[in-house]
Amino acid sequence: MRIRVPATTANLGPGFDSCGLALTLYLTLDIGAEADSWYIEHNIGGGIPHDETNVIIETALNLAPNLTPHHLVMTCDIPPARGLGSSSAAVVAGIELANTLAELKLSKEEKVRIAAEIEGHPDNVAPAVLGNWVVGAKLDGEDFYVRHLFPDCALIAFIPKAELLTSESRGVLPDTLPFKEAVQASSIANVMIAAILRNDMALAGEMMERDLWHEKYRSQLVPHLTQIRDVAKSQGAYAACLSGAGPTVLVFAPRNLANTLQTSLQTLEIDADVLLLDVEGSGAEVFR
């Protein structure tokens, strides 16, 4: 059996800790034969555990402690610590692993709830489970979210080789915002969401670049954001914004500009991969 979970981008600018979008990069987990102990082969390196302390296995065992150990093979196209939901993908893969092997028959809603409890909020895990675009909130321990189709557009991901830990990126954020600034930040997010629902990417893109919640603080850790935004906008893109906590920058553009933008971004003197992606519509899947 095979489990496949997509990458996700969170925030989309002003939709801080609320908006998430599934992308066509994947964590793939092949479930092999039963074994005496858990072992997971993977292509990540960097000290990621191979035993039951691995997040995937740990998550599965928290849900189903009596699972029979298996040999697992993980292939992950989602680079860690780049703002593309790698940890959320691992958590969701663990939930799917337990659900499959223990026949838990979890609903998608239950999967989102469990994953959001582990991750703290639903912005990455909800689109990883459900696919497409999700707007969510966690209030008094309860998850509220809406899944909707994202407008058709090209997505160009500028993924630096250097990592940026979420904890470091969150560390530069202020504890509070002045009331008037928070009201303005909220109104910007509201207009962005309304524009997306109306398939108006031009207006949505303008709002994406006017975030007041987090990007101006995180830009000190991601100095290439302004440079990429200038290049993208000069060539007709809708917007460029941080993917999650960064350092990845995601460019939204008309499809006919995708290749030109990719080429232009590849010429920047920053060590990075520049990938053409799409919105992933299905979310986590199990292939039997």
From Swiss-Prot:
It comes from the Bacteria. Pfam families: GHMP_kinases_C, GHMP_kinases_N. GO terms for cellular component: cytoplasm. It is an enzyme of class 2 (transferase). Its EC number is 2.7.1.39. The keyword Secreted does not apply. It catalyses: L-homoserine + ATP = O-phospho-L-homoserine + ADP + H(+). One of its GO terms (molecular function) is ATP binding. ATP binds at P79, P80, A81, R82, G83, L84, G85, S86, S87, S88, A89. Keywords: Amino-acid biosynthesis, ATP-binding, Cytoplasm, Kinase, Nucleotide-binding, Threonine biosynthesis, Transferase. GO terms for biological process: threonine biosynthetic process. Pathway: Amino-acid biosynthesis; L-threonine biosynthesis; L-threonine from L-aspartate: step 4/5. The keyword Nucleotide-binding applies. Belongs to the GHMP kinase family. Homoserine kinase subfamily. This is Homoserine kinase.
